From Swiss-Prot:
Induction: The stronger expression mediated by Pseudomonas syringae tomato during an incompatible interaction (avirulent T1 avrPto strain) than during a compatible one (virulent T1 strain) requires the resistance PTO-R as well as the Pseudomonas resistance and fenthion sensitivity (PRF) gene products. This induction is independent of ethylene (ET), jasmonate (JA) and salicylic acid (SA), and subsequent transcription of PTI5 does not require de novo protein synthesis. Also induced by Xanthomonas oryzae strain PXOA avrXa10, by Pseudomonas fluorescens strain 2-79, by PTO and by cycloheximide. This is Pathogenesis-related genes transcriptional activator PTI5. CDD domains: AP2. GO terms for molecular function: DNA binding; DNA-binding transcription factor activity. A motif (Nuclear localization signal) lies at residues 57-65. The keyword Transcription applies. It is found in: Nucleus. GO terms for biological process: defense response; ethylene-activated signaling pathway.
Amino acid sequence: MVPTPQSDLPLNENDSQEMVLYEVLNEANALNIPYLPQRNQLLPRNNILRPLQCIGKKYRGVRRRPWGKYAAEIRDSARHGARVWLGTFETAEEAALAYDRAAFRMRGAKALLNFPSEIVNASVSVDKLSLCSNSYTTNNNSDSSLNEVSSGTNDVFESRC
C-alpha cells in the first residue's frame, strides 16, 4: 500500500486505476498551480449581500409575469398537448394550486402535483362547498333540486351538491 502525500488514504499498488490516480495527484501536487480562484475573487462584495428575492421556488405549470403576477396553465393530452389557461394569480402558490386542481381533474391519481394530494383534495372540497353554499333568493319558485329554507319574508333556496 502506498499512502498519498496529501491525504492518508491508502492506495493498492496492484490496482492499475489507483496507480494512475496516484500519478495524476502527484503531478498536480508537483505543479502547485492554484486551480480555484480565491474566495474573495469569486463575487463582488455587493452581490454577496444581495437578498434572495430573485430565487423563488419553481412550480409545475406556473410562470412569473414581468410585472410580478403568476400565470398558471396546463397541457391537455386529450387535445394533443394544447395549452389550457388556468388564470393569473397574485402568488406562485395560488397558481400552483390551480394547476394541481386541473391536473387532478384531468389525470386523477396519476397526476404529477406541486403539493401533496391531501392538500389538493382539501382545496377541491372547500371550493365545492363554497359553490354549494351559495344561496338564491326567489319569489316562491320551486325546483326539485333545491331545498326550501324559510328566511323572513323571502324564500331562500340552497342547492344540493
